[in-house]
Amino acid sequence: MLMWGLTGPIFGTIADKYGGHKAISIAFLFYIAGIYFLFSGPNTGIYFQISLGVLIGIGCGGTAISIPMAVVGKHFPLSNRTIAMSFVTAVGSFGYFLSPIFTNYSLQNHGWVQTLIYFMFFLIVGLAISYFVRSPSLNQSTETTNKQNSLSALKEAFKTKSYVLLIAGFFVCGFHITLVGTHVPKYVIDRGLEDWTAAMILSLIGLFNIFGSLISGYLSTKISKKIILSVIYLLRGVSICLFIFTPPSTISSIIFGASFGFLWLSTVPATSGIVAHIFGTKFLGLLYGLVFLSHQIGSFFGAYLGGLFYDLYGSYDYAWYLAIALSIFAGLIHLPIIEKPVLRLKEEPVLRLKTE
């Protein structure tokens, strides 16, 4: 999670400066190498950490949602940018829905080595497709008015209160997602439910996130994005409360999987849309990459603290209480965000594709 987050801004900078296909292609090479060494290397802890933790972590930094989101965002004007971004999230969610189903089938029928080979093949296909990714360029007359570099873009962003609030809010998003994704399987078993219930919850999350992302993207063109984010985070707290305070059952698990899935990554179109609206799209890869770094730091703590609380107290209760408190925190801190472009930003230009 941390390597994924730390390399996101680096790949974002590469995408901003040299083009999206270069950043994504480099990341795919790391990802493929990590998968290859995972099934072909020695079965030792350090080798496992290098392949899975470092190489695959770096690969995720450039192939996961933040970089494709930034690349797509550059192609669309403000009026429909968040809708376009929501489609990126929705397609990724469809993969999240299919992945556990395919993985479980392949592990049972072919074993883990062959399963990893299948995944490596999928990544090679992704590498080939990434060659066709193209970034837009501004028309020449407008490029001369925007002489910002990466450093000045960072200084401007961190002097902007709304950007800092977005970073804090996305930390909570990462905490929620990894707490649920990592610890719900153990939690539902501890409550006396079958292990297939956990797989069902995760699959429902992936499925309903498709709809949540698309609806969030559409609503972001109609109403304030900060209000959408506040509502999403507060509803996450409600969903968690209903899940942990109602008697365990298959029905309650289905309701939680569907409701939390609807809210899962529906934060992404609105969050990335605010970043693009405030600062423009020239350094969207870098600036959104840093917001996503906060998300991954939150993911680290969601996974770590969930396990720590369980080891200390023998239950996940305190982890869930913290998640609910963070929902309230995130719901409130988005309200002061000002959804207006910085004074530097000129009228957004018409984009045209360039051949890289």
Regions found by a protein language model. Name each.
Residues 205-208, 222-274:
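C-terminal transmembrane helical hairpin of 12-TM major facilitator-type secondary transporters
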Residues 135-152, 343-351:
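Flexible cytoplasmic inter-helical loops of multi-pass small-molecule transporters
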Residues 87-138:
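Helix-loop-helix hairpin linking two adjacent transmembrane segments in secondary transporters
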Residues 7-19, 213-224, 311:
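Helix-to-loop junctions at the C-terminal end of transmembrane segments
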Residues 52-90, 280:
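Cytoplasmic helix-loop-helix junction between adjacent transmembrane helices
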Residues 155-216:
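Extracytoplasmic gate region of multi-pass secondary transporters
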Residues 46-63, 171, 252-266:
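Hydrophobic core of transmembrane alpha-helices in multi-pass small-molecule transporters
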Residues 29-43, 235-248:
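C-terminal ends and interior cores of transmembrane alpha-helices
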